[in-house]
Amino acid sequence: MEEIQRYLQPDRSQQHNFLYPLIFQEYIYALAHDHGLNINRSILLENPGYNNQLSLLIVKRLITRMYPQNHFFICTNDSNQNPFLGCNKSLYSQMISEGFAFILEIPFSLQLISSSSLSLEGKNVFKSHNLRSIHSTFPFLEDNFSHLNYVLDILIPYPVHLEILXQTLRYWVKDASSLHLLRFFLHEYWNLNSLITPKKPGYSFSKKKKRFFFFLYNSYVYECESTFVFLRNQSYHLRSTSFGALLERIYFYGKIECLVEVFAKDFQXTLWLFKDPXMHYVRYQGKSILASKGTFLLMNKWKFYLVNFWQCHFSXCFETGRIHINQLSNHSRDFLGYLSSVRLNPSMVRSQILENSFLINNAIKKFDTLVPIIPLIGSLAKANFCTVLGHPISKPVWSDLSDSDIIDRFGRICRKLFHYYSGSSKKKTLYRIKYILRLSCGRTLARKHKSTVRAFLKRSGSELLEEFLTSEEQVLSLTFRRASSSLWGVYRNRIWYLDIFSINDLANYQ
């Protein structure tokens, strides 16, 4: 039991008690800005008297103004005297949250450095940057999912109480002042800025405070997974112990002793033994997958176990409807922009023994990945490249650009789509997307020159849109040479590129 208690509190040896004074250091905010936190400078520039640099005096005053209860009274009294020091919640919440997130990451960064140094001493070099790609998950799924039967699709629950977010850090950060500021900050801006809203499953983050709340969310998920992985390992190790086929696993140690004694004396028969199959776990975008080769009964037990686990251990209201049991051969799922499924690939083998010949029907499971055409067209329609039905339209906001810039932007989007969906088993959908972007580019150029698409291409030449004709080949040339005609079949095969770290929203590409 003591071993379990030690494991339930992960290795938090890097506990620092002096994080709160770092909030008043100017270099913290400079480092936070340099690390790509994208502090909204437009908010700061709207305040007269501010010289685009964070000041220690400003930070102290902003923290002081977080504690009075009547913010409206402070605003009405101070805003006329000093416009900058008036009540601007978006200003100081933005400044402090970004700097505070950077400070809270220090214990985790130090632990990562210490763990990597220990692995180097043990001659077990671990390079985390090799595991950063989104596509690194798909080869794992190809190797394992074709041999599995059921999968649990889980929506990770969000904490219903703000205190849960603060408590996830209480073992890492022993600084009471920092935790107090964190609690006050969360409660103060929960309703004012809609930092985390349960409008849909998962989390909805404020764009201005994305890093801060992604950090809190990841620490919460880490706490969930650290406990869950330990309990799963305990269950996994139990499978080496032989036990009878009992529907109830409660007190099975005592039952197996009785069964073995009875069977050995009376029946002298060999017991049918079974083992818990290994569980494969994948987490992505607020969701997680538990896949196994076990039966529906086993997956149903894991479903109710997870519900009780989150409700009891994290006091989170978790509904059974957030976990779905699906059979891999009969269900496809939206996984990282792909429609993934395991389909049966039938094949027929002719066999002959002496004078007798017969046919054998064989079905091989194959992990299939398809391009979701409807969501892609929806993204293109949202970005004004086509209608909701997939009819290409011009992009008016790009009409003021030069012809080369317009073609370059359309070509860049097309190449990125071909690059990301190169792992698809069927690429016909990509050519439809390519057609939409190509015709949208032509209509944008025709709109700029006040002409029709046919007249513009006839006057400028069809080679003007050659960017789209070679988009796929240019992407694949990162690995294979385009000049080799013998590799034509390679372009039709799936290729997982390990340099893709994120999915860019086309609607935000302006």
Curated annotation (Swiss-Prot):
Cellular component terms per the entry's GO annotation: chloroplast
Assigned keywords, A-Z: Chloroplast, mRNA processing, Plastid, RNA-binding, tRNA processing
List membrane-spanning regions: none
**Where in or outside the cell is it found?**
Plastid, Chloroplast
Recorded GO molecular functions are: RNA binding
Keyword Chloroplast in annotation: yes
Per the record, the domain of life is Eukaryota
HAMAP family attached to this UniProt entry: MatK (MF_01390)
Q: What's the stated role of this polypeptide?
A: Usually encoded in the trnK tRNA gene intron. Probably assists in splicing its own and other chloroplast group II introns.
Family stated for the protein in its record: Belongs to the intron maturase 2 family. MatK subfamily.
Its recorded name reads: Maturase K
Organism, per UniProt?
Answer: Cestrum elegans (Red cestrum)
